[in-house]
């Protein structure tokens, strides 16, 4: 019998997430600069000093395939990153309305006037870390719901 992804995750070495926290990362001097906007100033360009990207972070890109999405309905999709202890590390959401032009999904019985389609979204996360040579285990959870289901 195949093990679930959660069971597989439990068998791996525990990652000590307490050794590095987001406050410590945000308070680091490298790669940061204070920016001040004056009243009524709506645009500003900033040039920062170079940073050493060899040991600053990891990039996680999550591609989500959404099937049977109703055309013309507003949908909100959320992507949640959870560590081994069940703590939410990060989350993002996207709200959008799918128009015609996606690939048909065959929701209607006659498969001709399908009121839905398939689409996809991408979520990108930068995960700060001290040691890129250490492993990191995350659980990714996708949730979706129509924003105005009664309309």
UniProtKB/Swiss-Prot annotation:
It is found in: Spore wall. This is Exosporium protein B. GO terms for cellular component: exosporium. It comes from the Bacteria. Its main location: other.
